[in-house]
Amino acid sequence: MKQIDLNVDLAEGCANDQQLLQLVSSANVCCGLHAGDYNEIREAILWAKENDVRIGAHPSFPDRENFGRTNMQLPDDELKACLFYQLGAVKALCDASGVTMEYVKPHGALYNMAAKDPHLAALIAETVKSVDPSLKLMGLSGSIMLTVAEQHGLATISEVFADRHYLADGSLVPRTRDDAMVENDEEAISQVLQMVLEGTVPTVDGGNVAIKADSICLHGDGEHAVVFATRIRRELKEKGILVTSSI
């Protein structure tokens, strides 16, 4: 049986967290520097525990004003301290709640920069490994970040997107382009099924490119998020695809 993980970001101030946790298998818990606070983080962890959803930390650059979406150049020691601070906070709240923090998925600009920057990717991998070498690193499928993480001995989770278009090299179409997003639910569902069942993804030039899909990111913001997640879950079930974090 084919299997796939569904992940969603939590504790970012969206009203859909509890509903989405009934539909996904992994939760990326905001660490408080791009959104959220200690109480929202604690609540998200408890809700995830209640729904038997795998928990990961979702650290960012210290950029609350721009929701962690601004590229930043921090000294290595400062960025490491920033990451230790965030991972330590979520791990401690998980421990206090009787659950395990199992993986790390960088957020926003940190995620996108590390996907292409070997030095930044290595810094993230070293920090994650120092916190707990059993932690997995979730990142863009086929990216430098995952390659570097594996070189550092970390297990990785290859993430793909239901609502993003892809270039011929397997990278995401930049958000600055008008065709970055998949706006139509039918197209998004078709793309998800192709990635899971065939191991390829359509590209904006009309072709297809091979892609490894361990986990699908479902964006949780917006009123449509729960409706879309419900439909994705139903379509996967109808195709005999098991939704699970045990990838």
From Swiss-Prot:
Domain of life: Bacteria
Chloroplast is among the record's keywords: no
Keyword flag ATP-binding: yes
InterPro entries, per the entry: Glyco_hydro/deAcase_b/a-brl, LamB/YcsF/PxpA-like
First-tier enzyme category under EC: hydrolase
This enzyme's EC code(s): 3.5.2.9
Keywords on record: ATP-binding, Hydrolase, Nucleotide-binding
Annotated SUPFAM superfamilies: Glycoside hydrolase/deacetylase
One GO biological process term: carbohydrate metabolic process
Record Pfam families: LamB_YcsF
Molecular function via GO: 5-oxoprolinase (ATP-hydrolyzing) activity; ATP binding
Catalytic activity annotation: 5-oxo-L-proline + ATP + 2 H2O = L-glutamate + ADP + phosphate + H(+)
Family, similarity comment: Belongs to the LamB/PxpA family.
Biological role stated in the UniProt entry: Catalyzes the cleavage of 5-oxoproline to form L-glutamate coupled to the hydrolysis of ATP to ADP and inorganic phosphate.
HAMAP family: PxpA (MF_00691)
Subunit relationships: Forms a complex composed of PxpA, PxpB and PxpC.
Annotated protein name in UniProt: 5-oxoprolinase subunit A
